[in-house]
């Protein structure tokens, strides 16, 4: 009889979701197996080697604040860092790091290899072992090995039924040079899961030695480096490399328009939906036909490799046309192409088949995370991965699952959208997707998430002490700013009045001064009124709490009001077909998605406020009838 190894948790796939899931489960005490097609491609960045950007940076901060890795990896392997939207409000500040893709993969692999309770293994999972009560019991690989576990996490990325396209040529692959995973899609379909197809793409890579940099606009990193991780041990000061900017030309646009029919999408070879917010260059030319030019960013992929990533220039054109297309860009007239661009089509599981814990509704103990759930982006994958890892561990250990509410984090917003909206295109997190973005800032991710990470067991004593010390310093600085005053006739008071074009009447606290437009903590420091012992993040934390206090209080009041209503639980066996006062479409959608709370029900596409009102009335009538029956029985 073949030997079967036993684990608590098995993770299938070692991309950004799989790495976070495996680490979380192992750190919570579960014997964990991480299975991957290729041990040399763990934590790989197959598209843009970058972490962060609008809303994505908030996810990276939140994962770190919970005890995850993606932020630490970016801080240890960055080539360049910039804060985007720095001139706007703190709700949309976004840190972005260009990373060294090979170094990133090497460092995360080392972290995984050194993690207690975690074992890595190369293998292709083709089947799931299912028990008599529709519970997962383990997995089987292509070559016949079996591994048993009480929880299995699917983080297969673009590999399920993966097929890459260049022009009208295709081959089975999860990404260039790596074979696709076979069999698992059929297993999921046999178990009753719905699967569908999505597509994404990646641009060509060119040799940095063949580029004319005099024709490009340099994009340097910020002189003052910021960090994703709240743990100073992850911070590595290093020399930054520049990125560059060029633009498409009329020649670029003509070449694309003349050859659209040769691309897999416009040629009709594939019809899977691609990412709306990261379109191919041909999509841009078609959708924005009135634009004369589009920005193209030239970004390094590593310190010691010659490859440049051509951001914003993914294409499905045939390989023999791609070089001609690249050479229409200023600065790239003589460029050498090292890797062609390609599109990849793959199977995914619409995430409405998952609970907000990321356990599937159909099979107990089976979790799904990352690109398999229909998302796009390393940060979205990492966020789902840590949630799946936490909840898989808690499931195995008989503990209650953790649900992240959308009003508490971008992680919660992401998962709530996935589980309640019938999304049929790759999902990318955006600040506009959160109704509470002023509260869900990057700077306060540790305030929001680290206490939960501590409660779960992912934040150790050292990290917790750092957190408490930081919060104490911010609170003390807020107190000082509200108490220390500047007098009208003091030289510093006169200087500030002149700077802000507003007189100081009698005296003003430093907090009053911070509330003035275009006056910041850095200005207090310029007048000798700051605290030089504080870290930048602590100064910003104190300033934001004071400057935006009114807005923050109003939004928190809105959240509290929404939470009171939205957290009302709905019976899991509720017969929506019986609510005849509700529209048929709403009844069908609610019966299909089975929301757990009133808030989830209200966010399902096709369910409007009138439907929610009808549901509330029906629930109240049912409650009254139950009370009357219980009263009659007592009598």
Swiss-Prot record:
Domain of life: Bacteria
Entry-linked InterPro entries: FAD/NAD-bd_sf (IPR036188), GIDA_C_N (IPR049312), MnmG (IPR004416), MnmG-rel (IPR002218), MnmG-rel_CS (IPR020595), MnmG_C (IPR026904), MnmG_C_subdom (IPR047001), MnmG_C_subdom_sf (IPR044920)
Binding positions for FAD per the UniProt entry: 13-18
Organism per entry: Synechococcus sp. (strain ATCC 27144 / PCC 6301 / SAUG 1402/1)
Protein's name in the database: tRNA uridine 5-carboxymethylaminomethyl modification enzyme MnmG
Family annotation (PANTHER family): GLUCOSE INHIBITED DIVISION PROTEIN A, PROTEIN MTO1 HOMOLOG, MITOCHONDRIAL
UniProt GO molecular function: flavin adenine dinucleotide binding
Gene Ontology CC annotations of this record: cytoplasm
């Amino acid at each position: 009889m073949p030997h079967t190894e036993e684990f608590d948790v098995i993770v299938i796939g070692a991309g950004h979701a799989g790495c976070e899931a495996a680490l979380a489960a192992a750190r919570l005490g579960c014997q964990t197996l991480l299975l991957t097609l290729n041990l040399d491609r763990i934590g790989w960045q197959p598209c843009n080697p970058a972490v962060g950007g609008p809303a994505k940076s908030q996810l990276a901060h939140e994962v770190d604040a919970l005890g995850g890795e993606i932020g630490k990896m970016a801080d240890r392997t960055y080539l360049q860092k910039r804060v985007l939207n720095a001139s706007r409000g703190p709700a949309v500040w976004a840190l972005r790091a260009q990373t060294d893709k090979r170094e990133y993969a090497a460092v995360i692999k080392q972290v995984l290899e050194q993690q207690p309770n975690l074992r890595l293994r190369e293998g292709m999972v083709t089947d799931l072992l299912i028990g008599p009560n529709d519970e997962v019991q383990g997995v089987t690989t292509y070559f016949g090995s079996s591994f048993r576990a009480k929880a299995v996490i699917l983080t297969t990325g673009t590999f399920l039924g993966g097929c890459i396209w260049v022009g009208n040529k295709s081959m089975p692959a999860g990404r260039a040079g790596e074979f696709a995973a076979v069999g698992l899609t059929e297993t999921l379909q046999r178990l009753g899961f719905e699967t569908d197809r999505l597509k994404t793409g990646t641009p060509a890579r060119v040799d940095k030695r063949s580029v004319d940099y005099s024709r490009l606009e340099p994009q340097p990193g910020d002189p003052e480096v910021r960090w994703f991780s709240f743990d100073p041990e992850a911070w590595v000061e290093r020399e930054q490399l520049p990125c560059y900017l060029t633009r498409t030309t009329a020649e670029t646009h003509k070449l694309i328009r003349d050859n659209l029919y040769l691309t897999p999408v416009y040629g009709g070879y594939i019809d899977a939906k691609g990412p709306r917010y990261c379109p191919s260059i041909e999509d841009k030319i078609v959708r924005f036909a009135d634009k004369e030019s589009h920005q193209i960013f030239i970004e390094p992929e590593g310190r010691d490799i010659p490859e440049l990533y051509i951001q914003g220039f993914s294409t499905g054109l045939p390989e023999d046309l791609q070089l001609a297309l690249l050479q229409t860009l200023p600065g790239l007239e003589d460029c050498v192409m090292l890797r062609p661009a390609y599109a990849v089509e793959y199977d995914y599981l619409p995430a409405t088949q998952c609970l907000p814990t990321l356990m599937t509704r159909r099979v107990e103990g089976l979790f799904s995370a990352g690109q398999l759930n229909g998302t796009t982006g390393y940060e979205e994958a990492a966020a789902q991965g840590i949630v799946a890892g936490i909840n898989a561990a808690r499931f195995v250990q008989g503990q209650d699952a953790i649900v992240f509410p959308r009003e508490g984090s971008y992680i919660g917003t992401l998962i709530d959208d996935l589980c309640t909206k019938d999304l049929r295109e790759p999902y990318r997190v955006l600040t506009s997707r959160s109704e509470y973005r002023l509260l869900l800032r990057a700077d306060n991710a540790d305030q929001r998430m680290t206490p939960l990470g501590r409660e779960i067991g992912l934040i150790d004593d050292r990290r917790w002490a750092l957190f408490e010390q930081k919060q104490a310093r911010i609170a003390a600085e807020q107190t000082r700013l509200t108490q220390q005053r500047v007098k009208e006739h003091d030289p510093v008071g006169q200087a500030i009045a002149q700077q802000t074009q507003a007189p100081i009447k009698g005296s003003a606290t430093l907090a009053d001064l911070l509330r003035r437009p275009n006056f910041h903590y850095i200005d207090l420091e310029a007048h000798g009124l700051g605290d030089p012992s504080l870290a930048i993040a602590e100064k910003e934390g104190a300033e934001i709490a004071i400057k935006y206090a009114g807005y923050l209080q109003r939004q928190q009041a809105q959240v509290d009001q929404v939470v009171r209503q939205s957290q009302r639980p709905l019976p899991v066996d509720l017969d929506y077909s019986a609510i005849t006062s509700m529209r048929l479409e709403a009844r069908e959608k609610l019966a299909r998605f089975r929301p757990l709370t009133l808030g989830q029900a209200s966010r399902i596409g096709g369910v409007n406020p009138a439907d929610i009102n009808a549901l509330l009335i029906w629930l109240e009538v049912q409650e009254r009838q139950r009370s009357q029956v219980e009263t009659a029985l007592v009598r």
